[in-house]
């Protein structure tokens, strides 16, 4: 039986699951979390379910135009959702929950195209299948309403960051180092929350590590630590017009992909693989630091989440880049604020499901450039 809510509870209060598979496409992060109006969210369980290489290959292939895309996308979506369901069952088991105790699952899907300038963003998913496999309400398709309102549909996490990480009197930056880097600027005194994508992060770092180490990522940044930053290559990478574009802006593998990197490398004589990795690490750090210097110069603290939070070489590079940019900010992970970095993105989509259930906006128009704040998502009942 569903748990009886206290008399002062909001009708949307309860336990939600959040699922996020990002641009690294290595697997899905999930959380089970209790939301109550006026209280901090309480995480009841977390899980990570990896993707088989065959699924990763299918998802990577869908990043670029190809033959028979509709069939390939549909099959990949079904395979993806079976892994989502495994994650949900693991969360349910770990937290000791019955299906009736779960209000809804908030699921992002897997981005395969992000072209808001053309009026669309595409996250492959099969929420109806997930509802069938879990017998829980599913809320999905969070980005398209923001795009329909003229926004970028990304980033969506800043509204959640403001709720959980904001602090009166202190300007903070939350930096997500996933496949793509993005920042949320939380003003300490008045002003609008802002946020946008800065550029590539693990998407290119992981690609290069896979190509030269045969491993899915550069464990602890050790590969990059063996190399030296190649300054002319770094300058060429930073010459990409996206870095100079003003916010609101968002990006993804449509731009920052292996073909982009190879085209840049073609202008240089042989560069040692470890030097390329060191340079890509510097690219991530410098592109983030420059945006912070330009848009949040008064920031005193940067809190990192995402997979890059586990890369000490990347975090040190970010500290160095901030000093070089004249920003005297400390760099820590969101664990310092009580939220493990690997949970943040999945928590954000559980929160978006909570907001949808309450029929409250999930975006920030000041972040995405939409015509206004909108209720995001679509419901697939169990």
Curated annotation (Swiss-Prot):
Reaction(s) catalysed by this chain's protein: 1,6-anhydro-N-acetyl-beta-muramate + ATP + H2O = N-acetyl-D-muramate 6-phosphate + ADP + H(+)
Keywords carried by this UniProt record: ATP-binding, Carbohydrate metabolism, Kinase, Nucleotide-binding, Transferase
GO biological process terms on file: 1,6-anhydro-N-acetyl-beta-muramic acid catabolic process; amino sugar metabolic process; peptidoglycan turnover
EC id: 2.7.1.170
Record flagged with keyword Protease: no
Family matches, as InterPro entries: Anhydro_N_Ac-Mur_kinase, ATPase_NBD
Similarity annotation: Belongs to the anhydro-N-acetylmuramic acid kinase family.
Name this protein carries in UniProt: Anhydro-N-acetylmuramic acid kinase
Gene encoding the protein: anmK
């Amino acid at each position: 039986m569903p748990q009886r809510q206290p008399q002062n509870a909001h009708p949307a209060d309860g336990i939600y699951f959040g699922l996020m598979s990002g641009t690294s496409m290595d697997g899905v992060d999930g959380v089970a979390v209790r939301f109550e109006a006026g209280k901090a969210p309480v995480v009841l369980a977390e899980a990570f379910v990896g993707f088989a290489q065959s699924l990763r290959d299918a998802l990577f292939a869908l990043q670029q135009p190809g033959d028979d895309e509709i069939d390939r996308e549909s099959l990949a979506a079904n395979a993806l959702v079976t892994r989502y369901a495994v994650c949900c069952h693991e969360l349910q088991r770990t937290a000791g929950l019955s299906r009736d105790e779960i209000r809804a699952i908030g699921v992002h899907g897997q981005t395969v195209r992000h072209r808001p300038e053309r009026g669309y963003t595409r996250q492959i998913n099969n929420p109806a299948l997930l509802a069938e496999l879990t017998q829980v309400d599913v809320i999905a398709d969070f980005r398209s309403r923001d795009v329909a309102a003229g926004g970028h549909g990304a980033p969506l996490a800043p509204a959640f960051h403001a709720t959980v990480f904001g602090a009166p009197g202190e300007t903070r930056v939350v930096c997500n180092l996933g496949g793509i880097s993005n920042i949320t600027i939380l003003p300490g005194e008045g002003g609008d929350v802002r946020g946008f994508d800065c550029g590539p992060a693990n998407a290119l770092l992981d690609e290069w590590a896979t190509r030269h180490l045969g491993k899915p990522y550069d464990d602890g940044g050790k590969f990059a630590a063996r190399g030296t930053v190649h300054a002319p290559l770094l300058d060429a990478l930073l010459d990409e017009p996206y870095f100079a574009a003003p916010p609101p802006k968002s990006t993804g593998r449509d731009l920052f992909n292996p073909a982009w990197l190879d085209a840049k490398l073609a202008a240089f004589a042989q560069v040692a693989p470890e030097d390329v990795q060191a340079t890509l690490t510097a690219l991530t750090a410098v592109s983030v630091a420059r945006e912070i210097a330009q848009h949040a110069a008064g920031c005193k603290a940067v809190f990192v989440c995402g997979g890059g939070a586990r890369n000490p070489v990347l975090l040190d590079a970010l500290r160095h880049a901030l000093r070089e940019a004249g920003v005297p900010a400390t760099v820590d992970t969101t664990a310092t604020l009580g939220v493990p970095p690997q949970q943040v993105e999945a928590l954000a989509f559980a929160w978006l499901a909570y907001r949808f259930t309450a029929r409250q906006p999930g975006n920030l128009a000041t972040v995405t450039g939409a015509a206004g704040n909108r209720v995001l998502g679509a419901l697939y009942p169990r």
